[in-house]
């Protein structure tokens, strides 16, 4: 059996190195209501995010519905599987189900078409606890991230990893020195799963482990874009930059945009100008790669944008933290606005029986005037959200106020229904108590003595009529 699975934490108390995250999860679970916000676990792979979610379900005795990257996550499938589960009760009664949606930062491509929008809709309507998991917080859609409470997971410390490896060696009856354990802990870079797998790979067929055995099981650590961009502006050695660019999963055009975004943060204006020249040359190589389909040029483009910009900055660093390309945010905003307008037109077209295209081209201004008279009523009638009302009213604050009014009214109605139900329940309980009291006040019914055994009645003896004796004459 795989040791990573064999020694997976079974309870939240077993999660190592992330005490603050565990406390936040426990507080959320104990006070959870249908109005509670979902949790978003973020952090690098192998530090216990999925294990914490499963342990939470086990500790709270909740059922689990898990949707991860191996599943098809189109809009239709997500709504059919997770959507139905988020609004229904447990299979075994009124218990809760924990819905775990893993790798929400990888919702892209044809396989996940419409998935982010479907998940956002589910988060708004869910009546069950939901946990979302992502390796990269920046990769999560804004429409999802703003609906969740973040729970950051940190890399596990070396001493904590070393202590856990020692426990596993004791359970498996394997001799392992402190130097070997230290090598595993340092090589795993805070990743518990990798550390356990390294220990398993090094101990296969052995009863003791040395440092030499550990060297054959080093972690295949993938560099992040933050490692690469940070190395470029921190003046990392050329060989290290080449290694980071090789290990980074980002494509060269994406890396170029990340580096370009950080160039304005350089201290020296003259160095900034020369750095832009390096980026321009890298862009030329990328263009030739696409036109000629000669992907060998990628290496020259990558070297120009990393080594070239690093040489111009000369390790001077920059003034703030690394940020994703701002153009991505603008593109995302434009795409979001387009999607909101389309969904708004669909809602209005259904309400007024007018084609969506005609709604967008001819009737939005007219409907805006209608909405301005009573925004809350318009919002409630067409079941619109804040973004859709913002397009109608051209005022985000007014849109938020209208939606808040509708939500408050709905909440008051729900509270009223709950109070009426509670009142009826109390009345029924009171009536039952009164009936029970009346039963106690009724005089006891006297017990009837047991009936004596009936004796069979003797039939009256009729007087025997004696027949007259015949006189016997004795003539003789």
UniProtKB/Swiss-Prot annotation:
Annotated region described as Disordered, given as residue ranges: 435-476
Domain of life per record: Archaea
Coiled-coil stretches noted in the UniProt entry, renumbered to this chain: none
GO molecular function annotation: ATP binding; ATP hydrolysis activity; DNA clamp loader activity
GO terms under biological process: DNA replication
Record InterPro entries: AAA+_ATPase, ATPase_AAA_core, P-loop_NTPase, Rep_factor-C_lsu, RFC_lid
Similarity annotation: Belongs to the activator 1 small subunits family. RfcL subfamily.
Functional note: Part of the RFC clamp loader complex which loads the PCNA sliding clamp onto DNA.
Record protein name field: Replication factor C large subunit
Organism: Methanocorpusculum labreanum (strain ATCC 43576 / DSM 4855 / Z)
């Amino acid at each position: 059996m795989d040791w990573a699975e064999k020694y997976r934490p079974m309870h939240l108390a077993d999660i190592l190195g992330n005490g603050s995250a565990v406390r936040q999860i426990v507080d959320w679970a104990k006070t959870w209501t249908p109005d509670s916000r979902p949790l978003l676990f973020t952090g690098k792979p192998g530090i216990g995010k999925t294990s914490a979610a499963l342990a939470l379900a086990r500790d709270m005795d909740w059922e689990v519905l898990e949707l991860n990257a191996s599943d098809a996550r189109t809009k239709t499938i997500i709504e059919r599987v997770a959507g139905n589960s988020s609004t229904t009760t447990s299979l075994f009664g009124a218990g809760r189900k924990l819905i775990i949606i893993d790798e929400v930062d990888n919702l892209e491509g044809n396989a996940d078409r419409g998935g982010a929008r479907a998940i956002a809709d589910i988060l708004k309507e869910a009546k069950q606890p939901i946990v979302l998991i992502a390796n990269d917080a920046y990769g999560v859609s804004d429409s999802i991230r703003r609906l969740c409470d973040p729970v950051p997971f940190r890399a596990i410390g070396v001493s904590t990893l070393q202590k856990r490896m020692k426990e596993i060696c004791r359970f498996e009856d394997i001799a392992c020195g402190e130097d070997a354990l230290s090598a595993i802990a340092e090589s795993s870079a805070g990743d518990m799963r990798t550390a356990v797998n390294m220990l398993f790979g090094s101990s296969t067929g052995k009863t003791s482990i040395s440092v030499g055995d550990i060297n054959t099981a080093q972690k295949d650590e993938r560099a992040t874009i933050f490692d690469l961009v940070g190395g470029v502006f921190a003046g990392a050695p050329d060989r290290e930059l080449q290694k980071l660019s090789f290990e980074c999963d980002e494509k060269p055009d994406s890396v170029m945009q990340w580096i370009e975004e950080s160039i304005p943060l350089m201290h020296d204006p003259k160095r900034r100008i020369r750095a832009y020249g390096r980026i321009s040359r890298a862009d030329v190589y990328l263009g030739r790669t696409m036109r000629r389909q000669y992907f060998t040029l990628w290496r020259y483009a990558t070297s120009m944008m990393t080594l070239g910009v690093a040489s111009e900055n000369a390790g001077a660093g920059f003034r703030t933290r690394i940020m994703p390309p701002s153009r991505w945010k603008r593109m995302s905003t434009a795409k979001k606005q387009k999607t909101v307008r389309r969904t708004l037109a669909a809602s209005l077209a259904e309400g007024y029986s007018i084609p969506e295209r005609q709604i967008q081209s001819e009737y939005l201004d007219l409907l805006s005037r209608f909405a301005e008279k009573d925004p809350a009523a318009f919002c409630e009638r067409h079941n619109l959200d804040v973004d859709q009302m913002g397009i109608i009213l051209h005022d985000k604050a007014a849109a938020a106020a209208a939606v808040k009014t509708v939500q408050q009214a709905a909440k008051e109605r729900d509270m009223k229904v709950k109070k009426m139900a509670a009142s009826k329940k109390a009345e029924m309980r009171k009536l039952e108590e009164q009936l029970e009291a009346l039963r106690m006040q009724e005089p006891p019914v006297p017990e009837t003595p047991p009936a004596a055994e009936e004796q069979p009645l003797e039939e009256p003896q009729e007087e025997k009529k004696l027949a007259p004796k015949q006189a016997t004459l004795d003539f003789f």
